[in-house]
Amino acid sequence: MHARWKGTVSGMLRISRDLYEKIIEHARKDHPDEACGVIAGPAGSDRPRRFIPMQNAERSPTFYRFDSLEQLRVWREMDDNDEEAVVIYHSHTATQAYPSRTDISYASEPQAHYVLVSTRDEAQAEFRSYRITGGEVTEEPVDVTE
């Protein structure tokens, strides 16, 4: 959706502890349904800055889909602010934090870090990041900064 992307793709997600914790908090709050959202950042920067939790239109424990009107509003807002979706995240409630075939087929933002959080273990959330381009999934390290 964001045709202006002009940055480079790094092989690591650098994310602040605050944003990291907000993603996990959202995933736990929406459990047993999958949670979803984006973290916007300056276009081309690969720097996640603005946390945008979104509604799972499916309200499902096994599938997520952004509400189309909310997604349109959020992407327009990012365009207006010269931002892009640096992170697109969602949770898995009963399986590991690895993209499903559906997740892979829906991945349409080549610049984005696709973050998955598994909430299957109440004591400890599993947080992982991937690049998904052309159907290929590559896990990348996550650097949580203070």
Cite the ranges covered by each PLM segment.
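Conserved beta-strand-loop surface patch within small alpha/beta domains used
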Residues: 2-85, 94-146
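Conserved, mostly hydrophobic/aromatic
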Residues: 88
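Metallo-beta-lactamase
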Residues: 91
